[in-house]
Amino acid sequence: MPVVTRLIRLKCVGLRLDRSGLNRRICHGGHGESTRRRVMEELSSLTVSQREQFLVENDVFGIYNYFDASDVSTQKYMMEIQRDKQLDYLMKGLRQLGPQFSSLDANRPWLCYWILHSIALLGETVDDELESNAIDFLGRCQGSEGGYGGGPGQLPHLATTYAAVNALVTLGGDKALSSINREKMSCFLRRMKDTSGGFRMHDMGEMDVRACYTAISVASILNIMDDELTQGLGDYILSCQTYEGGIGGEPGSEAHGGYTYCGLAAMILINEVDRLNLDSLMNWAVHRQGVEMGFQGRTNKLVDGCYTFWQAAPCVLLQRLYSTNDHDVHGSSHISEGTNEEHHAHDEDDLEDSDDDDDSDEDNDEDSVNGHRIHHTSTYINRRMQLVFDSLGLQRYVLLCSKIPDGGFRDKPRKPRDFYHTCYCLSGLSVAQHAWLKDEDTPPLTRDIMGGYSNLLEPVQLLHNIVMDQYNEAIEFFFKAA
C-alpha cells in the first residue's frame, strides 16, 4: 500500500517533532484532496531518517492502540509469551536449519548459544541426545591450540569462543564443562592480547571492545583470569568512551549499545569500572529508550528488539553500581544513611556466604566497586530509588511488537523473526522482569512482570548473559578445576 494512502487511512494529517524525534499526531480530518496534499507536503519535508522513524512509530502505536481497544481476553492472549510456540520454534532450529542459514556457517556456535540460552530462559532443557550432539559439535569447533572457531576446522575467533563457552555453560554438567580445554584456552587468550592493552578477535584480526569483553568474560567464567590478561585493558576501554557517554567499538567510534554493554561489563569484571565517567554513561544509556518504549542502539537510530538486552542490562548494572557506591542514580548525592547501612549489611552477608573460600580477594577499600557484588547480584535497587528506565514499557514493546505469535522474536514490526533477536529479546525481557531483584532466590513481584507470572523468565547473570543457575554451577566447577 502506498505510504500516503496508508497514512490517510489512519486519518493522520499532521506531524510534530519533540526531544525524542518524530511523533505522529492522529487527527480525525477528512479524506479529501486537501488532506492528501497536506500529508504529501509533510512527508516531502522529512529526511529519510525521519520518514523511517515516523513509519515505525505508526506501526508500533497502531499495535498499542489495537491492544488498548481490545477486550480483556484478547489483551491477555496478545500479552502471553506463548511458551509452547517459542519452544517449538527453538527446538526445530536446534535440530535442523534450512539452506537459508548457509550464510551463517561461520556463526554456528552462536546459533547454539542463541537457541540454548533462549530455551534455558524459558526454564526448559534439551533432551540427552540433543545435549550430547551439541557438546560433540562444539568440541569439533575447538581449535587444537585453544579457542573455538565458527565451525569445525575454522579459525578460532574470540566471538565464537565466547558463544561456544556460554553454550556449554548453559548446557551444564561435567561432560559439557570438562570439554573446554582451559589450559589451551588460556594460551589462546594470551595470543589474542595486544600490546595496546586490548584484544584482537583472531590471529592478525581487528581489535575492538567486543574482543576485550569476550576474552575477559571467558577468562572470568573459566577461572583463568590473571594480571597479564587485564594489563592495560582498562586504558583501552576508557579510550573508547565517547563525548556522548556511551562506549564505541574502538577509539573515535560512535557510542553503540552493544559496545557499551561489552565495555561496561568488562570494566566491572576487572574491577576498574570507577575509571569510566558513569554519570555520562548513565545519561546516554537512559536516553536510548524512545517513545516506542523499546531501546535504540545509537543516537537517532530506530528501535530494535535486540537492544532490550544490550541497553537494559547496562542501565541495571549502572544503577546497582550507584547503589554499591552509595550514590543516587545521578551520582550527585548519597542515599540516606539508613538505606546505606541496609545495603552494606545485605552486601556483606551475601559476600560472606558466597566467597568464604577466598576472603583474600575481597577489596577492603570501601570506596571502590567490587565486581563480586555485581557477580552475585548481591546489590539491588532499593524501592525508594526509581528505575532509570521504564521496565514495564520495555516489556510491553517486546511482548506486543517483537514477539511473533507462532514463536520467535523480531527486531520490530514488519521484520522477520530470527534466533539472534529471540535470544536478546528474551534476555532483555528477563532483565526487565528482575530489575528489582533483591537476590537470586527472591522472585519478582507480580506488578513487575507484564502479563503476570506465566510470563516469568529465569534470571540472567548480567555480566555474561547466562541463566543464574548454570552460571553458579560453572563457577563452582571451574573453581574446583583450578
Curated annotation (Swiss-Prot):
- Give GO terms for biological process: cuticle development; negative regulation of abscisic acid-activated signaling pathway; protein farnesylation; protein prenylation; regulation of meristem structural organization; regulation of response to osmotic stress; regulation of response to salt stress; response to abscisic acid
Subunit comment for this entry?
Heterodimer of FTA and FTB (farnesyltransferase). Heterodimer of an alpha and a beta subunit.
EC no. given is 2.5.1.58
**Binding-site list for (2E,6E)-farnesyl diphosphate:** 256-259, 298-301, 307-310
Q: How is the cofactor bound?
A: Binds 1 zinc ion per subunit.
Answer yes or no on keyword RNA-binding: no
**Region (Disordered) residue spans:** 329-372
Residues that coordinate or bind Zn(2+): 304, 306, 421
Q: Name one GO molecular function term.
A: zinc ion binding
Its function, per the record, reads:
Catalyzes the transfer of a farnesyl moiety from farnesyl diphosphate to a cysteine at the fourth position from the C-terminus of several proteins having the C-terminal sequence Cys-aliphatic-aliphatic-X (CaaX). The beta subunit is responsible for peptide-binding. Acts as an abscisic acid (ABA) negative regulator by mediating ASG2 farnesylation and consequently monitoring its subcellular localization. Involved in responses to salt (NaCl) and osmotic (e.g. in response to mannitol and PEG) stresses.
Cofactor(s) needed, names only, are:
Zn(2+)
**What positions are marked as the site Important for selectivity against geranylgeranyl diphosphate?**
110
Q: Name one Pfam family in it.
A: Prenyltrans
Q: Which UniProt keywords apply?
A: Metal-binding, Prenyltransferase, Repeat, Transferase, Zinc
What is the official name of this protein in its record? Protein farnesyltransferase subunit beta
Q: Tell me its family.
A: Belongs to the protein prenyltransferase subunit beta family.
UniProt lists compositionally biased (Acidic residues) regions at 348-368
Q: Which organism is it from?
A: Arabidopsis thaliana (Mouse-ear cress)
Q: According to the record, where are the PFTB repeats?
A: 131-172, 182-223, 230-271, 278-319, 391-433
Q: Which PANTHER family match?
A: GERANYLGERANYL TRANSFERASE TYPE BETA SUBUNIT (PTHR11774), PROTEIN FARNESYLTRANSFERASE SUBUNIT BETA (PTHR11774:SF6)
Record note on disruption phenotype: Plants show an increase in floral organ number, particularly in the sepals and petals, correlating with an increase in the width of young floral meristems. Increased sensitivity to abscisic acid (ABA) as well as salt (NaCl) and osmotic (e.g. in response to mannitol and PEG) stresses in term of seed germination and roots elongation.
